[in-house]
């Protein structure tokens, strides 16, 4: 079994992938698979042909297309697996764009990769960033900045972006009740696209 808290995917200076992991039984062979489809490893029981099989706890995988997001499946020789992706995405205009996938809830379920992201403001994305974010398939952007911040630096994801935008300003000191109020309907969420 993989220790998900010790499984990581990062890009190096050449934008190739450095993957590291820890298993509860070290020394076993691990096969690594790659896809550009975030749902591929969730849908298919057969991940295909491995890029690499190793007894090590790290691997360097060539990034064959730097404009596309890649997802990885690590499979132990016992058949146990872990789906991984980069936590911090390489965007020029916002250095803190992160995928929240891979985190485990108290109930034991794991959030899928490529479904929920968090970031700072999206108003300073480069054209290259716009193309990269478009391929992520975002459907909803929730802006938690204060209204003045949203007005001064509006979120823009490109002319042909296909997402809904929701303004959900969080005032300083109001974080404690924000989610509770959202669930109770005190804070309204409207489609403003």
Q: What role is predicted for each listed range?
A:
Residues 1-193:
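Cys-dependent protein tyrosine phosphatase-like superfamily
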